[in-house]
Structure formats: C-alpha cells, structure tokens
C-alpha cells in the first residue's frame, strides 16, 4: 500500500548480498492506483503470476530460487499469492496476517463493532463522527477506501473480509 521506493532499503541490501530484486507497482500501489485507477485485489495470485512469468525470463534469474516479500497489507497479499503460485520458493510476510478482516474488527472500539453488526448505515455514521475529530482517521479512511476500490468504510471492512487465508494457508509450499 506504498510506493516501491518506500522499501528501497530492502532491495539495496538484497543486491549487496547478490540477490536479484524486482520491484513493481501493483494494483492499489504507486502509479497503478494513481494513474491507472487499479485498486487492490484480494486474489493477489492474479497479480503475481504474470510478474513471475516475466521474472523467469530475465537473464540471471534462477527459476528455482524465486521469492516474494510482502510488507504491511502485503503480509496478506504475499502468502495469498504463494498459495497458488507454486514457483515461489520463499515467501516473506511482514506482518503475517491470516485473516485481515478479523484483525481489523478485533481492533475496533466497542462502539464501532456494535455499529458494524447493525449494518452499513449505522457503521458509516459512527465512522463519520470519528473522522470529524481526527485528521489521521479521516486520511486513513479516505486513502484505504480509494486504494481498495470501495465507496464506504463499511464496504472497506467487507473487502478486508475477503482477505482470509484461514482455509488456504496450509496449501503454501514456499518456505
């Protein structure tokens, strides 16, 4: 959910250690969202597989030693891709998030949790009250709703609910 340049320190250090590093701007990130309007998608394997298709064609890339690292929301996205993209031999998830929606809902204040159970109108009304008192909450919600291609905070939580690896994590073959 950031620009690739934000994690340049990772790639610089990988290169110093003899690794190849490929940094891309995927849906929900950088120019993909800002210029092309491509929001995040929960089925990240559909983003990663074409990238791996290109990577294995690059000179010097060992197709038996391809890894994927995901930071922040990538802590869900990278393992999701690894479930389906079997050419990935290593997957780093920081933080490793099994169920993004659940992890968000657990952190909600009781007032918001109760409103969520009541439905979209109640939840969005409570969120609007919070936004009015916090520039940080307002920015986070505007940014997240936009990057995930939804219209409301309630829809954002529903979108996060799609990001669930509970029944899929056992299928990851990457280390």
Regions found by a protein language model. Name each.
Residues 69-86, 91-93:
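Short glycine-enriched nucleophile-adjacent loop
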Residues 2-12:
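The serine-hydrolase catalytic nucleophile loop
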Residues 29-41, 102:
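Serine-hydrolase catalytic machinery in alpha/beta-hydrolase-like enzymes
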Residues 100-142:
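Helix-rich cap/lid subdomain of alpha/beta-hydrolase
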Residues 14-32:
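Conserved alpha/beta-hydrolase
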Residues 38-67, 77-80:
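Alpha/beta-hydrolase active-site loop
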Residues 132-175:
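Serine-hydrolase catalytic core
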Residues 26, 92-102:
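Active-site nucleophile loop of the alpha/beta-hydrolase fold
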């Amino acid at each position: 959910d950031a620009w690739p340049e934000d994690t340049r320190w990772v790639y610089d250090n990988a290169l110093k250690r003899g690794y190849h590093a490929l940094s891309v701007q995927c849906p929900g990130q950088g120019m993909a969202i800002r210029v092309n309007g491509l929001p995040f998608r929960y089925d990240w394997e559909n983003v990663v597989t074409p990238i791996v298709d290109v990577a294995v064609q690059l000179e010097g890339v060992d197709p038996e030693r391809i890894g994927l690292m995901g930071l922040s929301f990538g802590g869900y996205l990278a393992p999701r891709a690894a479930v389906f993209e079997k050419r990935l031999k290593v997957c780093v998830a920081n933080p490793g998030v099994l169920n993004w929606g659940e992890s968000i809902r657990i952190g909600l204040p009781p007032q918001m949790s109760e409103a969520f159970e009541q439905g979209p109108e109640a939840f969005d009304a409570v969120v609007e009250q919070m936004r009015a008192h916090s520039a940080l909450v307002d920015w986070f919600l505007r940014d997240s709703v936009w990057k995930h291609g939804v219209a409301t905070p309630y829809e954002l939580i529903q979108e996060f609910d799609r990001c669930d690896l509970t029944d899929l994590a056992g299928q990851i073959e990457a280390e």
